[in-house]
Amino acid sequence: MVQPAATPVSLPSPTVHRSEHTVTVAAPPEALYALVADVTRWPAVFEPTVHVRHLAREGRTERFEIWAEVNGEIAHWRSRRVLDPVRRYVSFRQEHSRPPVTSMSGGWLFRPLADGRTEIVLRHRFTVADDDPAAVARIEEALDRNSARELGALAALAETGHPVDELVFSFTDTLPLQGAARDAYTFVERAERWAELLPHVAQCGADRAGTGLEQWLEMDTVTADGSTHTTRSARICRAPEWIAYNEQRTPRLVSGHSGEWTFAQTPEGPVATARHTVAVDPSGITEVLGPDATLADARAYLRDALGRNSLATLRHAAEAAQRA
């Protein structure tokens, strides 16, 4: 006797949770849209973001990997975004979410208001495994905290009254290596030894987290005038090719600083490169550089100070590679 086919069991659809965060900013929507649309600047502008690496770009669509601080840990996921400069809208969707999140999407909207102001609306939609209430609460808490930090940083930068391109700048220094690039990478990765080996580092502690490929780095740096300042950084290490970092605690003249150390084999031989992206804090210019200093002076000062220290690190890394 033929048994009747079993009736398929339909599983309930996961609950879609929504959040919305807004802020009103004294800046035009075009400038704010441009800041959000350029994801390469995010690590220096948006404090939770540690590093971004593009996977693909085609027209108004882009895919990238992103590392960000979430609930005190460094999370990693892949996202797809669609940019709409006419509507001033940026939509996003995570391609691979981090458990317990099973999906995450949303968008940035920039609404022009009177007197040149803009309302920024940041929306999220997400689902979690098994609709776990505790997981939902954790995700909502993380979204509340990180959205407030992102919107606050965006407002602070845009409301300085200076063009973004005068506040946020990047530069790169490259050094040829006589030894293997892998050995130079190892020197930079093992930052806990820097205080013994680098003259501009007074103290440095490194705590590894998660898989051991992420680090929290706290460092006291000696400046040219002999004073010291303390920075705290999140680092992503991918041996033997690159180390990316984002400063969570910055010196007075800097509102954001991210960077990347890369180690590569070129047709001319192995090289090591240090790249910096810096957001200047205009409110610190007079205190640090004097009453007559300008934004251009601040950029030049930071280019010299940061470049000098990272080149010193690269030279010691090159020497270590040559000895290995």
From Swiss-Prot:
Residues 1-21 are annotated as: Disordered. Pathway: Antibiotic biosynthesis; granaticin biosynthesis. GO terms for biological process: antibiotic biosynthetic process. It comes from the Bacteria. The keyword RNA-binding does not apply. It holds the Pfam family Polyketide_cyc2. Keywords: Antibiotic biosynthesis. InterPro entries: Polyketide_cyclase/dehydratase (IPR019587), START-like_dom_sf (IPR023393). The keyword Magnesium does not apply. Is needed for correct cyclization of the oligoketide leading to isochromanequinone formation. This is Granaticin polyketide synthase bifunctional cyclase/dehydratase. It comes from Streptomyces violaceoruber. The gene is gra-orf4.
